Amino acid sequence: MKRRLVITTLAAAGIMLAACQRQAETMLEVTGHLFVFNYRNASATYLLTMKKTAPIPDGSTIVAEFENPQGGTPLVLNQKVFPMDDKISVQSENLHCVVKDRPYSVTVKLVDKDGKLLQELKAQFKSDLDQTVLPSKPLVVGAGYERNPEVFKPDGTTDFSNTDKCPA
């Protein structure tokens, strides 16, 4: 009788402890997303920031698929997630043809080291600037930020034109 009571009590305690442990619905949460326009380098990129909300298995990777403003296939970025990182930033390669007030989508997949999907996030980017505000060529070159002679001509004129060929 006493043995049965001990087993029943332990089983009940085990069930209660298991019920108290919350299974994490998400491991990552989007904390910010924006376009970064860098006039000095004549570049535009997507920047997505996330915070870790639960432990992520070692060897996990983020696979981000950014909509390509020029059209065509998405821009794909693979980035390893390190266990000590509480905040994670993902930045795309340089973009061309970003249009003001047009929504652009990104899909972020968190996969483990075996490629198993752990979580999928979606976000929408919208720029309050058109990429035509950027020059086609960087304003500066080199480590000393020297004026770019292709933009700042020897005769005193400047060429800030944007020569991107974008779909209408």
Spell out what each predicted region is:
Residues 31-52, 57:
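Contiguous beta-strand segments within globular domains
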Residues 16-19:
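C-terminal motif of bacterial Sec signal peptides marking the signal peptidase cleavage site
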